[in-house]
Amino acid sequence: ISLFLVDAKAPGVSLRAYPTQDGARAADVKLAGVKLGAEALLGTAGDALPVIERAVDYANAALCAEAVGIMSALNEVTLEYLKTRKQFGVPIGKFQALQHRMADMVIATEQARSMATLAAVRVDSTDAAERSRAVAAARAYIGAQARLVGQQAVQLHGGMGVVDELNVGHYFKRLTVIGLSFGDTDYHLGRFSDTLLAA
């Protein structure tokens, strides 16, 4: 595998931009008969796979950290909502069932924070297998926990959890996109098991 630098305006290059679920932008890139000179080659021919794998591991470690930040923000706004929203004359946070759900969200976030820290520490490893194993484990675990925290936050806010006026729905959408970026939870579980089998 080799990497090439291609001008987006070169003949044969077409882009189709579209909005992502979280409001960001992405594009499909189509290459049809694109011709490149030797100067477009980045690095040495055939040596790009380790560079790509390392870059993807760095991107995944960064997404782990972003997801934990969003999970923490969801915990904060949800706790505040439970303290202020009243039902039957008392804050809904007084109901034990909702306290348990909030506690589950906090536990999931703190465990995810530990996994994100593991990914951040190991992403600089010179051992590619160790790096990939740690990052894949973190992505798989955080993907599942982010889904739990996001869904609980939306549910605990009731109908307010999906209105544009609150950040809860926006945070949930971002967690959903993070969960699918560079592979979903099942993909990262597969990567993790592959690194164990190869060891």
Give the residues covered by each predicted segment.
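FAD-binding core of flavoproteins
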Residues: 1-76, 80, 90, 199
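Alpha-helical interface subdomain recognition
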Residues: 54-199
